């Protein structure tokens, strides 16, 4: 069977296009690697190659140049590109020992740059923050953009990364460009739908926050969770 090409993937699901639309934080590890490498080989598609590299990162933290070369589809050029990325991350990345952000109150979400970056956005953005068992932030990702409704915000999309992160809980955040902090009927419907899905999956929806004018409104505090 011929290798699957990036052009065979739905444009909305292509890694580089997803970065343009949603930002790099919305991508899984394998998708980020695919965006870096660009394309696969005749015998091994880029998604397979990037998944194998992502698996190595989980097992070996930072694989060596020689280890990368053992992956079918990675030659000296791709290995060098990845090693350069690893080194940049090592030089400029957040120190591993830095304390993670812990969310125990709604306002604590304002410590996350992806949330405060919602200021001035003309469209609604729906974000999900995954948390470990100690309520520490694992990752914050943009799930969708546009008018919030239950058809756009599907539990499958919301919880997919939480499952990958092995998260214990999530917090959903979306902005109201109008500046009105009050939840709409659609906000409440989406919140309850996601809460029920979380109960089935064993991943709690701790809160759904509305971001406006540098502040957040908690749907849990309002009694909708």
Curated annotation (Swiss-Prot):
Segments forming domain MPN:
102-225
**Record-listed Zn(2+) binding positions:** 174, 176, 187
Keyword annotations for this protein, in alphabetical order, are: Hydrolase, Metal-binding, Metalloprotease, Protease, Zinc
The record ties this protein, via CDD domains, to: MPN_DUF2466
Please name the GO terms that the record assigns under molecular function. Answer: metal ion binding; metallopeptidase activity
The UniProt record lists the keyword Flavoprotein = no
Q: Where is this motif: JAMM motif?
A: 174-187
Q: Which InterPro entries match?
A: MPN, RadC_JAB, UPF0758, UPF0758_CS, UPF0758_N
Q: Which GO terms describe its biological process?
A: proteolysis
Please give the family membership noted in the entry: Belongs to the UPF0758 family.
Record-linked PANTHER family: DNA REPAIR PROTEIN RADC, UPF0758 PROTEIN YEES-RELATED
Instruction: Supply the name of the protein.
Output: UPF0758 protein Mhun_2739
């Amino acid at each position: 069977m011929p290798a699957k090409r990036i052009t065979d993937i739905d444009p909305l699901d292509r890694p580089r296009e997803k970065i343009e639309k949603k930002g790099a934080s919305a991508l899984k590890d394998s998708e980020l690697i695919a965006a870096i490498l660009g394309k696969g080989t005749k015998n091994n598609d880029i998604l397979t190659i990037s998944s194998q590299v992502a698996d190595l990162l989980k097992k070996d933290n930072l694989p060596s140049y020689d280890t990368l070369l053992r992956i079918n589809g990675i030659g000296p050029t791709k290995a060098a590109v990845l090693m350069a990325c690893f080194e940049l991350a090592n030089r400029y990345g957040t120190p591993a020992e830095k304390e993670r952000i812990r969310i125990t109150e709604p306002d604590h979400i304002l410590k996350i740059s992806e949330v405060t970056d919602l200021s001035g956005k003309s469209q609604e953005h729906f974000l999900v923050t995954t948390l470990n068992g100690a309520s520490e932030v694992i990752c914050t990702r943009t799930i969708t953009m546009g008018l919030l409704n239950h058809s756009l915000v599907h539990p499958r999309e919301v919880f997919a990364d939480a499952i990958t992160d092995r998260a214990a809980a999530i917090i959903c955040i979306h902005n109201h460009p109008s500046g009105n902090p009050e939840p709409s009927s659609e906000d409440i419907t989406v919140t309850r739908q996601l809460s029920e899905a979380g109960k089935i999956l064993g991943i709690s929806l701790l809160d759904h926050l509305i971001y406006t004018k540098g502040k957040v409104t908690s749907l849990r505090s309002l009694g909708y969770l």
